[in-house]
Regions:
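Catalytic beta-strand/loop cores that center a nucleophilic Ser/Cys/Thr
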Residues: 396-472
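Short beta-strand/turn micro-motifs composed of small residues
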Residues: 199, 304, 374, 453
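Alpha-helical scaffolding within the catalytic cores
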Residues: 283-286, 326-330, 355-358, 458-465
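The feature marks non-catalytic terminal segments
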Residues: 1-28
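Proline/serine/threonine-rich low-complexity linkers at boundaries of modular beta-sandwich domains
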Residues: 21-33, 164-174
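A glycine-rich, often tryptophan-bearing local segment used as a flexible ligand/cofactor-contacting loop or short
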Residues: 345-428
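Long beta-sheet-rich domains in secretory-pathway and surface-associated proteins
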Residues: 39-289
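Aromatic-Pro/Gly-enriched surface loop or interdomain linker
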Residues: 262-343, 396
Length: 472
């Protein structure tokens, strides 16, 4: 009665809100449950998938499932849902060829600086994509038609977590994942770039090639790949040749082509316990940067911080970076290395690192180089990191949040800014999010300052880089 009476309301906005509320109330009080389940999590256009429609009525209320509509395909049902009797219907379904890949709508187009380009403004503001497959269940409840929508999902049973739901995604028949998002050509015009090719469907073949700027040469011209089973992987290499090119920055794209279409997307999963699985289909591209670099040091010992990508970057420019643990740090081991680096927030991972001071000071006295990176002020004070350092300093909560805030060099002749490579203001171009935070605001006279920066109207932060020479 009440649901039908809502049709008399002329205000469409409030009518829709109240209809939704009553539908949720009907669903809750009858214990009505329904879902649409795919046998796979991801399928390419043209793939055949199996879909199970399931429903149960946990009440004596007279409920009849009349039909289910999926992407304009009507599936007649006409089944009376008797109290606590489970209903299931399985169908085979071909994924339409015209469906777009399920990439996040704000990431389909490559963003520019601080701006995302969205093709369909109707998506704007939505926290995620709407499901590519929506099933509509048409019920007759006590003589009244009530319709509910259900997104297509893949469900597995996890022994510890129970039912594990993943939103069904439309993918490609093939994915290309570059090994690195950025490749650095250091003192060289040629380099092999590695990609991983993954089959998105059974019995699929294509040619993998490169879209490169004019003048950038590569070999081979293409790789022919064939897969028997979905999920198979192959690793391929292309040699990129920048000989004779004056530019130092390039973007290259990888493409897979079959008889009908071409594809230039990879696949990536963001998987954490506290959020639903996020499936991404990023563009298959690599940024190339070419430059010359003088390296006095070759071997670096590194103590990792959480989510630390610095070792990867150092490896790309030719350093040998060994990830060590607290237990491996001793003078004999450190003598093998040109430098020891504490990772970003390394003390968050292992508080006992502060106990390494005797070994590290001996290493420094013998001529070793030690770099301690970013730490928060609370961690600094709670762990009394001042007792770990050779000289005192205090960490503040000061920050430089303006990405383009000018950087000023305070000591242009300092060796750290000139050897083995000269550091100039251009090296601070392209820093994003912010210039820095948790700057030291007090330090011993034994430290030298190299750079300073500040937001408009704020005091300069001279403690971005502090250096002290000890021993050899």
């Amino acid at each position: 009665g009440a649901y039908k009476e809502l049709n008399r309301i002329t205000d469409r906005h409030w009518r829709d809100i109240k209809k939704k509320e009553i539908k949720n109330l009907i669903k809750a009080t009858t214990g009505l449950f329904f879902e649409s389940l795919s046998d796979v999590e991801i399928a390419a256009a043209g793939d055949d998938i199996k879909i199970n429609f399931e429903a149960i009525n946990r009440s004596p209320v007279d409920i009849n499932l009349k039909k289910i509509v999926l992407l304009d395909n009507e599936i007649p049902i006409n089944y009376s849902l008797i109290n606590n009797q489970f209903f299931r219907k399985e169908i085979s379904f071909s994924v339409p060829d015209d469906l777009k890949i399920s990439e996040k709508y704000w990431l389909v187009n490559k963003p520019s600086f601080g701006t995302y380009s969205i093709d369909d403004l109707k998506d704007l503001g939505a926290p995620d994509n709407s499901s590519a497959f929506i099933s509509k269940f048409y019920f007759e409840i006590e003589g009244h038609e009530v319709t509910y929508s259900s997104p297509l999902e893949n469900k597995t049973n996890n022994p510890t977590k129970g039912d594990d739901y993943k939103t069904f995604s439309v993918g490609n028949p093939i994915y290309i994942n570059p090994k690195n998002e950025m490749e650095l050509f250091v003192n060289s015009n040629k380099k092999d770039i590695e990609i991983e090719v993954i089959a998105g469907k059974d019995n699929y073949s294509s040619n993998i090639t490169i879209d490169a700027p004019a003048g950038v040469k590569y070999s081979p011209e293409f790789h022919a790949v064939s897969f028997e089973r979905k999920g198979e992987k192959k690793t391929l290499k292309f040699e990129i040749d920048l000989s004779g090119q004056k530019d130092t920055n390039y973007d290259i794209k990888f493409r897979a082509s079959d008889e009908n279409k071409s594809y230039n997307r990879g696949i990536d999963f963001i998987n954490y316990d506290h959020i639903p699985l996020q499936t991404r289909f990023p563009e298959s591209s690599v940024s190339i940067k070419k430059f010359n670099l003088n390296s006095k040091s070759k071997k670096i010992a590194y103590l990792m911080g959480p989510g630390d990508l610095v070792p990867q970057s150092l490896g790309l420019v030719g350093y040998q970076v060994d990830l060590l643990t607290n237990e491996q740090i001793n003078l004999k081991t450190l003598r093998k290395y040109d430098a020891l680096i504490f990772g970003v927030r390394a003390f968050n991972v292992d508080k006992s690192l502060t106990q390494l001071k005797p070994q590290i000071m001996s290493y420094i006295e013998e001529g070793g180089n030690v770099i301690v990176q970013y730490n928060t002020s609370s961690r600094w004070n709670n762990l009394d990191l001042n007792s770990f350092l050779p000289h005192n300093l205090n960490i503040s909560r000061n920050r430089v949040s303006e990405e383009n805030a000018p950087v000023t060099i305070l000591n242009a002749n300092h060796p750290a800014l000139n050897t083995p490579n000269k550091i100039s203001l251009n090296d601070f171009d392209g820093w994003v999010q912010e210039r820095g935070l948790y700057f030291p605001n007090e330090w011993s006279v034994n430290y030298e300052t190299l750079i300073t920066s500040n937001d408009k109207g704020e005091k300069p932060n001279d403690g971005g880089i502090l250096i002290s020479k000890i021993g050899k």
